[in-house]
């Protein structure tokens, strides 16, 4: 489940990429949520459209809650966004007036609008995302190359991979999740503390080395203040040095869910890699995804369903494994079982206590690319397109750029 295993193949392998650099400045990456609905104008929650820069969604929520006094547990958001780039998204704040929100002045956050609504905004309550991406230092014929690749993606679909941004700054969030699912709590703590080769700053590296040498107090004193998770875990471990499970449960519940979700994502990506060249075809035994309503059905006659797949009405699905996930049959089922077995997990492993139970669901192996546009601005190549909720622009960039290690 190492990261490089997810970056080995392309759907458009026969087409050369643009190369180039991405995310050199925040303005290179702009994402705007496409809302499912607008606030109704009444209720105890304020829906605020924010523009955040250089901070994660969770950090934006922390800052909003500190500024308004709203409890984090009652604050809602539709989608998780990372720190790099500029994001426009909606968050809901309980028992705070729109006027109070509009009057906020918070570093890294600009309030664009605020209105009342009756209920908390829930994860997944968005139609999709619009992206504007700027690529720098591309090859001279980058526009022609990108156009050819986008044409294929528009016809065959975008591989619905999660990709490396799902695995955290050190690229091991999925491994933390797998250790938790396997009940390897010491392994989870070791991974949480990090790898000194993957962090910046002598103090941070020294903190990790101190932990590895068993010096918990020394490690705690060295970890920088922004390493909140590591410090919380160490504080618990210092009180009970052998209780690694208790230490892991010092992690914020949202973060624990993220680690588990990252493991699900890595396993899905592995299935996708195996089926990459046939993501626009269904096979017998598949659970096919209906793009008009998100329902799934068992494919019993692949030949009969082929025209619907060609029209992009349906697509094969892959697993977000869980204790109650519906499994396919036949060859697709055998493939998915082999990948779960290789990870040393079973469906029952996802039935965790403490609000961490992962029931599982199906996810389409491909998604439609909506409204792709290309433009050349000075010496840069600018891409614009939309994707459904839960799908990532990096899946498009990876095909377009074909350069490892550039964030795509």
Curated annotation (Swiss-Prot):
PROSITE patterns: TRUD (PS50984), UPF0024 (PS01268). Belongs to the pseudouridine synthase TruD family. Its EC number is 5.4.99.27. This is tRNA pseudouridine synthase D. Responsible for synthesis of pseudouridine from uracil-13 in transfer RNAs. The lineage of its organism: Bacteria, Pseudomonadati, Thermodesulfobacteriota, Desulfuromonadia, Geobacterales. It holds the Pfam family TruD. One of its GO terms (molecular function) is pseudouridine synthase activity. Keywords: Isomerase, tRNA processing. InterPro entries: PsdUridine_synth_cat_dom_sf, PsdUridine_synth_TruD, PsdUridine_synth_TruD_CS, PsdUridine_synth_TruD_insert, TruD_catalytic, TruD_pseudoU_synthase. Transmembrane segments: none annotated. Residues 157-367 form the TRUD domain. One of its GO terms (biological process) is tRNA pseudouridine synthesis. The keyword Isomerase applies. The active site is at residue 82. It catalyses: uridine(13) in tRNA = pseudouridine(13) in tRNA.
């Amino acid at each position: 489940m190492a990261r490089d295993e997810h970056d080995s193949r392309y759907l458009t392998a026969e087409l050369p990429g643009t190369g180039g650099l991405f995310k050199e400045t925040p303005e290179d990456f702009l994402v705007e949520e496409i809302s499912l609905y607008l606030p109704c104008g009444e209720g105890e929650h304020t829906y605020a459209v924010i523009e955040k820069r250089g901070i994660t969604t969770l950090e934006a929520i922390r800052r909003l809650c500190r500024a308004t006094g709203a409890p984090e547990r009652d604050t809602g958001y539709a989608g998780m966004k990372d720190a790099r780039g500029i994001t426009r998204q909606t968050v809901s704040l309980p028992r705070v007036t729109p006027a109070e929100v509009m009057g906020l002045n918070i570093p890294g956050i600009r309030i664009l609008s605020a209105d009342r609504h009756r209920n908390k905004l829930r994860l997944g309550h968005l139609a999709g995302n619009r992206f504007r991406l700027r690529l720098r230092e591309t090859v001279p014929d980058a526009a022609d190359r990108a156009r050819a690749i986008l044409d294929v993606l528009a016809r065959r679909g975008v591989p619905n991979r999660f990709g490396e941004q799902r695995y955290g700054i050190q690229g091991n969030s999925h491994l933390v999740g797998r250790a938790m699912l396997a009940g390897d709590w010491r392994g989870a703590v070791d991974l949480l503390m990090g790898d000194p080769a993957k962090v910046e700053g002598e103090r941070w590296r020294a903190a990790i080395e101190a932990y590895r040498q068993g010096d918990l107090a020394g490690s705690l004193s060295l970890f920088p203040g922004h390493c909140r998770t590591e410090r919380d875990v160490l504080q618990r471990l210092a009180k009970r040095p052998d209780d690694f499970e208790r230490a892991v449960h010092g992690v914020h519940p949202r973060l624990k869910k993220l680690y588990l979700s990252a493991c699900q994502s890595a396993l899905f990506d592995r299935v996708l890699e195996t089926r990459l060249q046939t993501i626009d075809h269904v096979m017998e035994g598949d659970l096919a995804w209906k793009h008009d309503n998100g329902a799934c059905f068992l494919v019993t006659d692949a030949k009969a369903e082929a025209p619907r797949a060609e029209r992009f009405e349906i697509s094969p699905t892959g697993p977000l494994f869980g204790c109650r996930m519906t499994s396919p049959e036949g060859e697709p089922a055998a493939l998915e079982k082999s990948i779960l077995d290789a990870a040393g997990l079973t469906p029952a492993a996802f039935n965790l206590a403490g609000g961490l139970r992962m029931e599982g669901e199906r996810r389409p192996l491909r998604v439609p690319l909506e409204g792709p546009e290309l433009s050349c601005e000075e010496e840069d190549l600018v891409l614009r397109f939309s994707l459904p909720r839960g799908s990532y622009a990096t899946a498009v960039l990876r095909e377009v750029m074909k350069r490892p290690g550039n964030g795509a």
